[in-house]
Design a protein with these regions (language model features):
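A glycine-biased structural micro-motif
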Residues: 106-107
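Short helix/strand-capping connector loops at secondary-structure junctions
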Residues: 145-157
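Short alpha-helical linear motifs
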Residues: 133, 151, 168-169
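Short, histidine-centered active-site or binding-site loop motifs used for metal coordination
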Residues: 14-16, 114-116, 149-151
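Short, glycine-/small-residue-rich phosphate/pyrophosphate-handling segment
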Residues: 110-147
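N-terminal beta1-alpha1-beta2 submodule of the flavodoxin-like/Rossmannoid cofactor-binding fold
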Residues: 1-102, 156-180
């Protein structure tokens, strides 16, 4: 177990717009685990709705959208969960990231949790999200968590190994951020 500074800000993002989706379940576990640390944590859950579509650098977006972009920009660490859709990460996640100014994110750290119905596409999506993080000059934990949907049931993670791997991803990502 690592000791982290209270002034470290963590943003957990559930990148699926589907309510009660496996991505949301997975990232709620991450939020609960992070809350045990001595850090500030916020949760952006795209399934809650109310996030606008990016239309360029205009100022008339709703408060929820602008606050999410501000929270992401101010966070030291991004813990991102995304489903795989046709070997691609979530378009809703991509839309949210469009609101973030890459000039204000250098040196941040990200951890990834990726969920799919089967075993195909994980490294494709890992590569795409890592490249996106690179554009934002965000250092990405090289060990993501890959989860298949059969590890979820009745709104819960049913595989203890998945919980353990998510916890390890959080710890390693926070340790990487601490060293950065």
């Amino acid at each position: 177990m690592y000791n982290f500074q209270i002034d470290m800000k963590i943003e957990v993002i559930s990148g699926s717009r589907r309510e009660n989706a496996n991505t949301e379940i997975m990232m709620k576990h991450v939020v609960e685990y992070v809350k045990q640390k001595d850090v500030e944590v916020k949760f952006i859950n795209l399934s809650e709705g109310g996030f606008e579509y990016y239309r360029g650098w205009v100022s008339n977006y709703n408060e929820k959208t602008l606050q999410a972009a501000k929270d992401i920009t101010e966070a030291d660490v991004w813990l991102i969960g995304t489903p795989i859709y046709n070997s691609m990460y979530s378009a809703a996640l991509n839309n949210l990231i469009e609101f973030v100014n890459y000039k204000e994110t250098e040196g941040k750290t990200a951890g990834l949790a990726i969920i799919a119905s089967g075993m195909i596409g994980f490294t494709d999506v890992q590569t795409l999200v890592t490249q996106l993080m690179s554009y934002f000059r965000v250092i990405t934990n090289p060990v993501p968590v890959f989860v298949t949907a059969d590890k979820m049931a009745d709104g819960k993670i049913i595989d203890e190994d998945v919980k353990s791997r998510l916890n390890q991803m959080v710890d390693k990502t926070l340790e990487l951020a601490k060293r950065n």
